[in-house]
Design a protein with these regions (language model features):
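Short, structured segments at the rim of ligand-binding sites
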Residues: 1-172
Length: 172
């Protein structure tokens, strides 16, 4: 995994939330810092994500929002208005999709407030042809009760053609 400090915000947020992640085998790859990660099960807790941390994880906020829905406590995401002008309006879509799956999510002008809680349930969702939305909610669907269907889910091929194959391998 790339661990460049300008792009490692997801790793920092995971640790803030209580994730048990060890960084191993640090090295240079294509002139960038990289490492292997050892991730072990841990209960996650809510946190505040804002300010200078946002640019280091702007593309990972959809999956962080999914994590927050399963975490204990409240997660507040602020200063993320840039998500409104990505491949889709990711802020609105994330709120809508999490709510459709039963999460307690309140939109704000520049982010959202997510109250983690009971297990989510399956839902019919639209990728909006946004690969990060499709991948994030595929993960949410796996961790939820019932079936989740994502339309145009093959949009993940733009960035991660083997995503579904790799995700399925984690189920076993």
């Amino acid at each position: 995994m790339g661990i460049n400090p300008t792009r490692d915000g997801i790793l920092r947020v995971c640790r803030q939330m209580g994730a048990n992640i060890q960084i191993l085998n640090q090295r240079e790859h294509c002139q960038e810092p990289a490492a292997d990660l050892l991730v072990k099960y841990s209960s996650l807790k809510g946190t505040v994500i804002q300010g200078e941390l946002i640019p280091t994880l702007i593309d990972e906020l959809p999956v962080i929002a999914v994590m927050a829905a399963f975490a204990e406590g409240v997660t507040v995401i602020r200063d993320a208005q840039e998500l409104k002008v990505k491949e889709s309006n990711r802020l609105d879509i994330m709120v809508h999709h999490l709510q459709a799956m039963g999460a307690d999510v309140t939109p704000t002008e520049d982010g959202m407030i997510i109250k983690g809680g009971p297990l989510l349930h399956g839902a019919q969702l639209d990728s909006h042809l946004d690969h990060r939305i499709a991948m994030s909610f595929a993960v949410a669907g796996l961790a939820s009760e019932g079936e989740t269907e994502i339309t145009q889910a093959d949009c993940v091929n733009i960035s991660y053609p083997k995503f579904y194959e790799d995700l399925q391998s984690l189920q076993h």
